[in-house]
């Protein structure tokens, strides 16, 4: 939805002062630009793999501000700001992460595709979701969430000294237009500090979509030399979607650590009900573990749904663990 200043006014009480001031300053250009407020609220009751009973986020909760300005000649300026939070407490999702943790980008979009600058998901994490029954979005049941990219952080230290998984700071992102179903995607980060001898981050993905089929081949390397390679294939016919993926990630060290993950998934749509199941086998330096996930969603509307999720981890060495829960998601 397109928002007026009146709609924004209550929001100013919770947004950082700088962001509110920036939106007010942009008011004179509101007629030429479209600003959209969207997001998702998710909360569930569940028992985790650590056997703790919790009320909290099972999927993700976020508030997003995005917009575009028509510059003429088929060219548009774009921006996106996404804040992630815990719906059960209202707190920022993880201590140490930036306020606009989900994304903070500005860019240009046209016949050439789209280029963005700032913070966003890298090329692998931004495109792998189509090959998991839960879209890599369920901490209980998703084989992707619990296994993919096991040894790979987009940056080992960019999260206030801790590892950053999935997102790049100071990044450049490019998505090509689709030509006969084919598209190319790139992400990279090249900024460094004086005396910093780290390398660059760069990733590339090739995707195809058509005739019910989707396929991807993607890879990325972070500034520490860690690598990830991802391959996925899915087919949708009628109410069924079948999918599979293979992921290989290597942590660069004096003795490298290699994780290999193969996953399979199925999704069946039955009116307002979606049934899901997935399996994954993970091998980390010869230590194997398999994972099984099952779940069901029921959609009350296009925006509101309830779900049930179950996941079980079965390592060859150590104890098995199960997680299960129910939840509700509302998008706007």
Residue ranges and their predicted role:
Residues 45-51, 85-91, 123-127, 192-194, ...:
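Gram-negative outer-membrane beta-barrel proteins
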Residues 294, 320-332:
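Outer-membrane beta-barrel "beta-signal"
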Residues 199-293:
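Detector for outer-membrane/organellar transmembrane beta-barrel domains
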Residues 35, 74-77, 112-116, 181-184, ...:
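Repeated loop/turn-to-beta-strand initiation elements of outer-membrane beta-barrel proteins
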Residues 1-34:
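Cleavable N-terminal export/targeting peptides
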């Amino acid at each position: 939805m397109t928002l007026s200043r009146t709609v924004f006014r209550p929001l100013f009480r919770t947004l950082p002062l700088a962001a509110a001031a920036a939106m007010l300053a942009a008011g004179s250009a509101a007629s030429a630009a479209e600003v959209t407020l969207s997001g998702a609220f998710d909360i569930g009751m569940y028992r985790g793999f650590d056997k703790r009973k919790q009320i909290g986020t099972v999927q993700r909760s976020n508030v997003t501000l995005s917009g575009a300005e028509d510059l003429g000649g088929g060219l548009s300026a774009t921006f996106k700001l996404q804040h992630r939070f815990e719906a059960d407490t209202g707190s920022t999702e993880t201590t140490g992460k930036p306020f606009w943790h989900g994304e903070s980008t500005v860019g240009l979009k046209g016949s050439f595709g789209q280029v963005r600058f700032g913070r966003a998901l890298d090329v692998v994490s931004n495109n792998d979701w189509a090959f998991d029954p839960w879209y890599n979005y369920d901490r209980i049941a998703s084989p992707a969430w619990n296994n993919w990219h096991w040894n790979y952080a987009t940056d080992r230290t960019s999260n206030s000294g801790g590892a950053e998984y999935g997102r790049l700071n100071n990044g450049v992102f490019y998505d090509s237009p689709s030509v006969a179903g084919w598209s190319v995607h790139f992400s990279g980060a090249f900024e460094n500090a004086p005396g910093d001898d780290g390398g660059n981050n760069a990733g590339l993905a090739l995707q195809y979509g058509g005739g019910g089929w989707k396929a991807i081949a993607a890879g990325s390397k972070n500034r520490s030399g860690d690598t990830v390679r991802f391959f996925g294939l899915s087919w949708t016919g009628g109410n069924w979607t079948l999918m599979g993926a293979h992921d290989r990630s290597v942590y660069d060290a004096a003795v490298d650590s290699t994780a290999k993950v193969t996953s399979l998934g199925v999704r069946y749509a039955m009116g307002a009900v979606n049934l899901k199941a997935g399996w994954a086998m993970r091998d980390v330096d010869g230590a194997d573990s398999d994972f099984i996930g099952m779940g069901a969603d029921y959609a009350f509307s296009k925006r509101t749904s309830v779900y049930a999720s179950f996941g079980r981890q079965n390592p060859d060495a150590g104890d098995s663990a199960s997680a299960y829960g129910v939840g509700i998601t509302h998008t706007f």
